[in-house]
Design a protein with these regions (language model features):
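Substrate-binding/gating loop at the entrance of the active-site cleft, primarily
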Residues: 1-28, 46
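Histidine-centered beta-alpha loop that forms part of the nucleotide-sugar donor binding/catalytic region
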Residues: 11, 18, 72-73, 101, ...
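Conserved SAM-binding loop
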Residues: 15, 115, 206
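Structural signal for conserved beta-strand scaffold positions within catalytic alpha/beta enzyme cores
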Residues: 15-17, 98, 192, 229
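Active-site phosphate-binding strand-loop segment of PLP-dependent enzymes
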Residues: 21-108, 114-116, 263
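PLP-dependent aminotransferase class I/II
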Residues: 28, 32, 40-44, 49, ...
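Short glycine-enriched loop/turn motifs at secondary-structure junctions
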Residues: 106-110, 197-200
């Protein structure tokens, strides 16, 4: 989803290696991928914890780039800057994007999402784009689309938003239970939380060591324990991005993780 919109806008997505512990974009690798054509950095706060936003924002300022946070899996997550200031993910970059798909930590009854920004001009344009480009009804200033949040979804989310902290606390409690149960098991690496970030556990994702993942997946299914692979094929290896030079990337950490991760139920 993160890269689809880039391609739909006829822009070129450029993939960067991830941190082997957090699964988020490796800030140390970003500058190597920047060219004179680069317009924005899009960090994805994967599985429920933040990318290294302080370093990313410094790189963006240095190269005069926008930062668009994909916060779909980390709503409610706290990022701590080196000066001790804490800020919610999705509010650090120029724009923050989140999803209200039912499986998300703050999910609606169907599809939906939201954008966050402190930039009044960006907010003005976004409000027009999501409403057919209208500045006022029937007066279209720019090309837009119908991306308004349905009233039903808004009503449900209005109630659930008040309970978001409780939902996150329950997920953390479940993660602690898993961590205790798996302690000492050398074939399982439990989720790592970087010192600069909170973890809201949208997914509880393990890294397996010398384990037959498909066999484990089958065994769990036979015992009525759902498990999922997020994600079996990394974005740079998807056929849809072949025309963008996807096959030219050398991202060994990403490839290795995609072969070894498995996610267990958490809610």
């Amino acid at each position: 989803a993160t890269t689809e919109v880039i391609a739909l806008l006829r822009l070129k997505p450029v993939f960067v290696e991830v941190d082997p512990k957090t699964f988020c974009i490796d800030a140390d690798e970003i500058e190597k991928a920047i060219t004179e054509k680069t317009k924005a950095i899009i960090p994805v706060h994967l599985y429920g914890q933040s990318a290294e936003m302080e370093a990313i924002m410094e790189i963006a300022r240095k190269h005069n780039l926008f930062v668009i946070e994909d916060n779909a899996q980390a709503i409610g997550c706290d990022y701590t800057f080196s000066n001790g200031v804490r800020q919610k993910t999705g509010t650090i970059g120029h724009i923050g994007c989140t999803s209200f798909f039912p499986s998300k930590n703050l999910g609606g009854y169907g599809d939906g999402g939201a954008l966050f920004t402190n930039d009044e001009e960006l907010a003005r344009r976004i409000k027009m784009i999501v409403n057919h480009g209208q500045k006022e009804r029937y007066y279209h200033e720019i090309v837009g689309c119908n991306s308004r949040l349905d009233t039903l979804q808004a009503a449900i989310l209005d109630i659930k938003l008040k309970k978001l902290d409780d939902y996150i606390a329950a997920r953390k409690k479940a993660a602690d239970y898993y961590n205790t149960a798996f302690a000492g098991n050398k074939k399982i690496n439990t989720p790592y939380t970087a010192p600069y970030t909170d973890h809201v556990f949208h997914q509880y994702t393990l890294i397996l060591e010398d384990v037959n993942r498909s066999g484990l997946n089958k065994y769990l299914a036979e015992h009525q324990v759902p498990s999922m692979i997020y994600y079996p094929v990394p974005a740079h290896r998807q056929n849809m991005f072949a025309s963008f030079g996807g096959g030219d990337y050398h991202l060994p950490v990403t490839d290795r993780l995609s072969e070894r991760v498995i996610s267990l139920p958490i809610h």
